[in-house]
C-alpha cells in the first residue's frame, strides 16, 4: 500500500458546559469539595468524509461531543431549606413545645413535673394532645409552687367576692322558763266573736227565698196520714197482725 492511500483522520471536539446548582446537606465542607463535574462524551463515527477529485489524500473527520455539567452548591437552596424547616406550616414546628410535656414513641403526650419538696419528678399521665398535657402540668405547677409558678398558659385570676351572711342568734328556752316576745309565735285569733253568726247560719233547709227564688213548691211533699196503730205508743209492743191486715 502506498503512502498516498493511507486515510487521514482528523478529530474535532465540541464541548458544551452547563452549570447546575444543587443542594447539599454537607454544609461543613468547602465549596471546592462539594463541586463536582459530570462529563458526557459522544463520538460520532459517521461524520462526513471530505475528499477531492484529483485523488489526493482522503481526510476523515471524527467529531467528539463532550457535555460538561458542573454541579455547584446552591446557597439559595440552603437558605430556602432552612426557612422551610422553620416554617410554621410544617407539622413538626406547628406544634408548640410546652413545658413539662414530651411525646411518647407511640404518639401520645406525657406530662410530668419536678416536685421541689421531694426533689424528684412526678408523673402526671399521658394524654391525646399536647394541650391537654400542658393544662395538667399548669395545675400541678400552681399547686406545688403557688400562683407565681411558670406555666404554659396564663393563669386566670378570679376575683374573690366576700359575701356577708347575717345570722340571727336564737336562744333556746328551757321548759318552764320565760320566752321572749320574738321567740313566741302567737296563734292567729278568729275574727268572729262568740255572738256573731256565720254567713249561712240564718239560711235553713230549702229557704232559698233569701235570694229571691220561690222554690218552696218544688220541695213540698203530699201529706199522708197514718193510723194510730203506727204511732200510738212509742214503746208499745210490736204486733205482727197489724201488718198482716194491711198486706191483705
UniProtKB/Swiss-Prot annotation:
* Residue ranges of the motif Nuclear localization signal: 81-97
One Pfam family per UniProt: AP2
Q: Which InterPro entries match?
A: AP2/ERF-transcript_factor (IPR017392), AP2/ERF_dom (IPR001471), AP2/ERF_dom_sf (IPR036955), AP2/ERF_ERF_subfamily (IPR050913), DNA-bd_dom_sf (IPR016177)
Question: Taxonomically, which superkingdom?
Answer: Eukaryota
Lipoprotein keyword on record: no
Which residues form each disulfide bond in the chain?
A: none
Any GO MF annotation of the entry: DNA-binding transcription factor activity
* GO biological process per UniProt: defense response
The UniProt annotation puts the region (Disordered) at 74-95
Tell me the keywords, alphabetical order. Activator, DNA-binding, Nucleus, Plant defense, Transcription, Transcription regulation
Gene3D superfamilies from the xrefs?
A: AP2/ERF domain
DNA-binding region residue numbers: 97-154
- Record's subcellular location: Nucleus
Instruction: Summarize the subunit comment.
Output: Interacts with the Pto kinase.
Q: So what does this one do? A: Acts as a transcriptional activator. Binds to the GCC-box pathogenesis-related promoter element. Activates the defense genes of plants.
Question: By what name is this protein known?
Answer: Pathogenesis-related genes transcriptional activator PTI6
Q: Which organism is it from?
A: Solanum lycopersicum
Amino acid at each position: 500500500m502506498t503512502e498516498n492511500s493511507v486515510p487521514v483522520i482528523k478529530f474535532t471536539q465540541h464541548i458544551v458546559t452547563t452549570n447546575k446548582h444543587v443542594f447539599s446537606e454537607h454544609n461543613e465542607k468547602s465549596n471546592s469539595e462539594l463541586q463536582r463535574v459530570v462529563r458526557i462524551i459522544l463520538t460520532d463515527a459517521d461524520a462526513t468524509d471530505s475528499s477531492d477529485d484529483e485523488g489526493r489524500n482522503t481526510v476523515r473527520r471524527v467529531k467528539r461531543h463532550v457535555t460538561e455539567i458542573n454541579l455547584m452548591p446552591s446557597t439559595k437552596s440552603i437558605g430556602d431549606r432552612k426557612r422551610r424547616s422553620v416554617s410554621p406550616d410544617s407539622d413538626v414546628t406547628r406544634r408548640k413545645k410546652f413545658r413539662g410535656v414530651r411525646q411518647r414513641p407511640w404518639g401520645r403526650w406525657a406530662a410530668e413535673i419536678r416536685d421541689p419538696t421531694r426533689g424528684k419528678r412526678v408523673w402526671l399521665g399521658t394524654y391525646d394532645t399536647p394541650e391537654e398535657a400542658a393544662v395538667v402540668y399548669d395545675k400541678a405547677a400552681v399547686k406545688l409552687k403557688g400562683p407565681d409558678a411558670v406555666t404554659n398558659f396564663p393563669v386566670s385570676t378570679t376575683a374573690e367576692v366576700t359575701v356577708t351572711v347575717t345570722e340571727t342568734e336564737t336562744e333556746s328556752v328551757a321548759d318552764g322558763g320565760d320566752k321572749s316576745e320574738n321567740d313566741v309565735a302567737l296563734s292567729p285569733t278568729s275574727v268572729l266573736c262568740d255572738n256573731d253568726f256565720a254567713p249561712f247560719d240564718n239560711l235553713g233547709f230549702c229557704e232559698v227565698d233569701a235570694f229571691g227564688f220561690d222554690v218552696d213548691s218544688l220541695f213540698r211533699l203530699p201529706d199522708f196520714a197514718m193510723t194510730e196503730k203506727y204511732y200510738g205508743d212509742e214503746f208499745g209492743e210490736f204486733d205482727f197482725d197489724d201488718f198482716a191486715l194491711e198486706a191483705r
